[in-house]
Structures are given as structure tokens and as C-alpha cells.
């Protein structure tokens, strides 16, 4: 889990645009971020299995 200070730091508007980076809205993880949902892969998978994200289904072919 990300430290609270890092979450707050990422949420503040940056002085320069290139310094901004994405973090998961739930856990604050900076890696494996999915822009479309605003979540990291761990939180996305958890919420998808619980049915909390509308329109998401497990792939089967």
C-alpha cells in the first residue's frame, strides 16, 4: 500500500505537467494503472470479480 503522504503528493496539482503521474484511486499504487477505470490491476480484478464494475466480464473464447 502507498503511504498516505505519497497519495496526497500525487493528488496535488504539479508545478510542471510532466511531473504528474497516475495512481490507483483505491490503494494508491502507481504501477499497472488502467486509465479507463482509474484503478490498478489488483483493485480492478477484485472489483470485477465482485461485479462492481458494470459491463466487465471475464473473457472466454
From Swiss-Prot:
GO terms for molecular function: rRNA binding; structural constituent of ribosome; zinc ion binding. Coiled coil: none annotated. It comes from the Bacteria. Transmembrane segments: none annotated. GO terms for cellular component: cytoplasm; small ribosomal subunit. InterPro entries: Ribosomal_uS14, Ribosomal_uS14_bact, Ribosomal_uS14_CS, Ribosomal_uS14_sf. Keywords: Metal-binding, Ribonucleoprotein, Ribosomal protein, RNA-binding, rRNA-binding, Zinc. Its cofactor is Zn(2+). Binds 16S rRNA, required for the assembly of 30S particles and may also be responsible for determining the conformation of the 16S rRNA at the A site. Belongs to the universal ribosomal protein uS14 family. Zinc-binding uS14 subfamily. This is Small ribosomal subunit protein uS14. It comes from Symbiobacterium thermophilum (strain DSM 24528 / JCM 14929 / IAM 14863 / T). The gene is rpsZ.
